[in-house]
């Protein structure tokens, strides 16, 4: 009988010891200093003690406050201390969002000023901690309006389970499955105190959500970057998740991959990798970034292609020319020839345009033409933007302009220094350029009727006209006075020499403008085009055409509704007076003061306007250096 009672007595003794430990030992062990080995009783060290009487002595972890922002409020310190000491929350991290200086607009950074993230031991622990915290905020800080999300009380869960059992019997139903996201695994509290938000999560849920990555600084993001798990799972969503997060195999479409471009694959969470590629691309490290190629990812290939352009622009011209062949081969190898997007073709145009300007004999203008033809043949429609790019290349091409690049200069993609190479007439050069533009326009707009394609200009973007006017004029000539140069001149130019233009094609453009844009002076865009045309004619000293065009513009610039209040714009008149004065022709200046000045007053222009007065003062010095004429104007 005694033998039969011993196991029961021993089991009862073990339960008694465990209950004593739970009641008296838990708080002190978890929150007391670490015990030394000498403080353990001899009974615990007895090797003959049965296993069911042995208990593990848990060594307490020291309480450590996390690093808090320097300018954080005192209440944040108090709350974090309360979470650790009273609620038992572990691994707390605090993120300061009050000084967000990143250029990218991220909505997650505008939720609050301080984000606190902590880990609980279990779902029940988090439920208890959330309830205790709401009571603490209410009684300690008097904030009954604090909001909590994600807290599901046991009573609600029990009622939900009973309701499901009544509907479907005792068998489990799809609605009862939490799909791995159990209740109280993530609790968020808006404390309504100093813009502090608190997130309590279980360890598993915290790892899955990785909230730290949302609110950490850009420098710390690699610390929280998670690699996609590769282990197989029997989760019903594992197949879908694996499809969307697995690395995609690079397709070659029958073309062998160049040996210097090893394959690069990136997982679904790839922001750090993309940031690294952006840095490499902007710095021009095309050899380094080429290691990360993936022809299935247009974003990556665009960065690789742009790195070649940035590399070239960061070099002196002589070194850039030395690397040109190697750079060209690397660019063409990285270009996705069979599935290139419109952006890829645009980047390729910029690269080829740069190479053509550097060495026109090695890369002729035909490579730029072939790039657009290639884009069209691959199913991409040529747009007005492409037309502008093409005209810009025609204007700046050293081959078409019979010029060469000065090897002693530094290359600049926007303003490249060229020198004239021959004596070919400007008109023949201009005609050749316009022929190429007309051919390209037919490619962009195949439905245009045969004949002069410039007659259909009214259907294009108005910004194309200044480019065409540049083709028919010599704006780069050393004697040509541009509007910018005119504003910088403080005195008239002595003995200004006329700068010729392509009269035939300028007249054709003027005819198109006369039909499509008669009201020159009523619209800002058309007004600038009108000023450009006047400048071309004035630089050629064709003053009769200048005034004829001016009269036609004034006649067509009357407001449509005569009863409306119409105040004439003084800026075109001020520009015309300044243009006549700075070119410095005394005879023409006197004609203007005799005939055009009364016309200006008749059209309601205020002669006391500061711009009018400044330009007129210079004009009077040109027309009457002895200061004896035009008393009425003075």
From Swiss-Prot:
It comes from the Eukaryota. Residues 1-36 form a transit peptide. It is found in: Mitochondrion inner membrane. Gene3D superfamilies: Beta Polymerase, domain 2 (3.30.460.10). It is a peripheral membrane protein. GO terms for biological process: mitochondrial gene expression; mRNA stabilization. One of its GO terms (cellular component) is mitochondrial inner membrane. The keyword Mitochondrion applies. Keywords: Membrane, Mitochondrion, Mitochondrion inner membrane, Transit peptide. It holds the Pfam family RsfS. Signal peptide: none annotated. Its main location: mitochondrion. The keyword Membrane applies. Probable mitochondrial mRNA stabilization factor. Belongs to the ATP25 family. This is ATPase synthesis protein 25, mitochondrial. It comes from Komagataella phaffii (strain GS115 / ATCC 20864) (Yeast).
